[in-house]
Amino acid sequence: MNDNLKSFLDQKVAQYNRPEFIANDPVSIPHMFTKKQDIEIMGFWAATLAWGQRVTIIKKCRELITLMDGAPYDFIINHEEPDLKKLLHFKHRTFNDIDTLYFIAFFRQHYENYDSLEDAFVPSNKSVILNDSEGSIREYALQQAEGDPTVETALNYFRSYFFSLPDFPHRTKKHVSSPSQKSTCKRLNMFLRWMVRNDNNGVDFSIWNKLKPADLICPCDLHVDRVARHLKLITRKQTDWQTAVELTEGLKELDPLDPVKYDFALFGLGIEERWGIEGIMPEF
């Protein structure tokens, strides 16, 4: 372990893992709610729409909340067909009304059967049979017989489950990634961080417990990737799922129980301090 690096990053975690930074971050969207299902729905949606400028992301999420009458869970469960008309013009970048309506359809069928979105990632029963995105039948054994589920298993399961409704729009598949596609799954890993981490600092929610903080994979976006490479936490040339795993394994050397807390440090250095864009980056 590099003690100097750990000390430096721990200081940066303390600097950026604070409620003062919530307002300007997409995590502010689920923080608008107290009902668990509203937090899950808008946390997932905010993470999905999290590309581009943060001001725009937050603005579009607030627009979506307004279109759902300020109560996403209630709207999704109780809406009637005419209620969906006002959503037909919602768009953020390549996310459009077709995607919006499918998200609502998925959430409705899920919450009619489960109390929490957590079951969409780690079902309560040992194995689940469902129609996968190619229309064939698969069985997902979620490692609960031999041990705890992994994030990789959970994300691969989630994508197949998410697109298990009949006649799902194929265009929407680009908005939900998975490790099996070699994606870093940055947005989904960020969402899982929000739902799972439990440091009581008031940023992450800690409303899920089937996955542990030690299981999480660090979200790896352009800014985190740039900083992590300078710190030699990433050596892999390409940026894919294995890159996110490599980064997380390096962070586990600093804190094996909560490696993803360093997302605050890496992201803060990349965005707030513009490491790699402005100024001189120290060596460790």
Whereabouts are the PLM-identified features?
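HhH-family (HhH-GPD) DNA N-glycosylase catalytic core used in base-excision repair
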Residues: 1-284
